[in-house]
Amino acid sequence: MDNAICMFYIVKEAPMISGAAYVVKALQEEQVDILFNYPGAATIDIMDELYKQDKVKVILPRHEQALAHAADGYARSTGKVGVCMVTSGPGATNLVTGIATAYSDSVPLVCITGQVDLGLMGNDAFQEVDTVGIVRNICKYAITVRDRKELGRILKEAFYIARTGRPGPVVVDIPKNIQKAMGSDEYPTEVNIRGYKPNTTVHVGQVKKACSIISKAKRPLFLLGGGVSISGANDLMMKLVEKTGIPVVTTLMGKGAIDSRHPLYLGNIGIHGGYAPNVALTDCDVMISIGTRFNDRITGKLSTFAQNCKIIHIDVDAASISKNIKVDIPIVADAKLAIEKLLEYIEPHDLGEWPAQLQQLKADRPVTQAGEEGLTPQIVIDYINNHYARPIVATDVGQNQLWTTQFLELKGQHQMLTSGGLGTMGYGFPAALGAQIGKPDKRVFAICGDGGVQMNIQEFATAMHYRLPVTLIILNNGFLGNVRQWQQLFYDKRYACTNLLMDESAIVTRDMIDNDKFEYVPDFVKLAEAYGAKAMRITKVEDIEKGFQLADTFKDGPTLLEFIIPTELNVLPMVPAGKSLSDMLLKDKK
């Protein structure tokens, strides 16, 4: 009998780890270095695994909404995906405003929410809400993990979806029993999602058509939105502007698409845009719009917008094209790829007096508060322009946001963080903290109003805890200023529910400021000092430098600089609701 040869094969199985440990491994595989987290029972197993490692630093803000805004600020300032985690129920619902804010402004976030056991879902369990049902319409994608085997695929897809195409937030809801379940530790290396294929090419034929139209234009204009900076196309955009000599206007989110000091840059357009930019938008014969959505803040009355021009619209999101404004040449593409092709095919031509006419108009009708006496937001913001090179500035929402976008000089991407789409009060301060964490060597400012800053003022504790040297600037006029401005101009000064002063019949005047008769709750200086921060109240122009010097020298935490300004100082120009851009108010109604 022949000798039998027996062969044995040893199959090495992948190590088995818990779902909680797998989540941490996924974060590490995706090169996540910062996780913004607020703990709870539904995520305690993941937190325990985070405790055992040192690759992912965990930041503990003091409220889930602020946590989302901090992750948002981190993402906008670094260009990376921001990652946050909260518990189930109220943890998830507190996150909702931050998710919607990021979705409106195309900010890539991965939001992990804890959830009750699968077997308890639908039974009104403690801290149970239908998280996916709540957020489905305010994020790119939301899913509850129902099988431990699917956890890797879902997390891999979450990061891919968040950062590709039009970026945005993705919500992954992980039940507690999935976190405890054992499974393979293998993490996927590829993504293949049926039905989700972001466009990565440019239709050259459409680009050539666009170039043909531009070559015949006598009054062409670039309208740049947030998509230019999101795609990292700022340097290429500058080359395109200089090659063509075409003037540039921007949306609020688009500011920084090119250097705002460039001679061809006219300023912001829209309902609080400058006179020259809005006139240019009305008078141009060809508009090249890149990375914009044409929302109502840009267009004013839709039926009167850009009636006499051809519109070329470039956007990565096909759903944004011809959604509000019918366009002549649609190009669905990433802004950077499209600009590269425009540079390849476009040929400059003589634009006559058009650029010079617009520059003269800008000089004749500047956006300025130069006629105001005493301390103004413009003077404060000009100090930043003149003393800091490429700082990061986060704004809140309201007059503070609009003044900042009017007067702040930007030199490129990742410099100004603001809630442009949703208009979320309480965004500015936590977003600045997230930016400081992401860019520790950068000078970071938050410019807020006295109303919005109180929505997340508790984040002073976070700033002190992590020694974040953010400078919080509060423009304090004693009111919810943006609404009050509308009440002044269109509601006969009936200041209903906007007065934040102790005396509800008072307004802040220059006389009150000069004579120190300003009564306000809280005392922001004492509040900041209670957290261990430095603070100073400033009422005179000559004290501005002293305030910023205080902020520059304190490195162990935040500094609060409170600037007292008159209540009835308004943001102008302004387009009234329902009016066209040509109906701008250039000065206050008497």
Regions found by a protein language model. Give the residues of each.
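Short glycine/proline- and acidic residue-enriched helix-loop micro-motifs
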Residues: 139-141, 192-194, 359-373, 508-510
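Flexible, glycine/charged-enriched surface loops at secondary-structure junctions
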Residues: 167-170, 348-361, 368
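Thiamine diphosphate
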Residues: 112, 121, 126-127, 271, ...
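Active-site diphosphate/adenylate-binding microenvironment
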Residues: 20-23, 28-33, 46-50, 359-436
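Short acidic loop-to-helix transition motifs that present clustered carboxylates
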Residues: 43, 64-69, 400-402, 540-544
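N-terminal alpha/beta PP-like core and its mobile active-site loop of ThDP/TPP-dependent enzymes
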Residues: 10-349, 383, 470-472, 490-497, ...
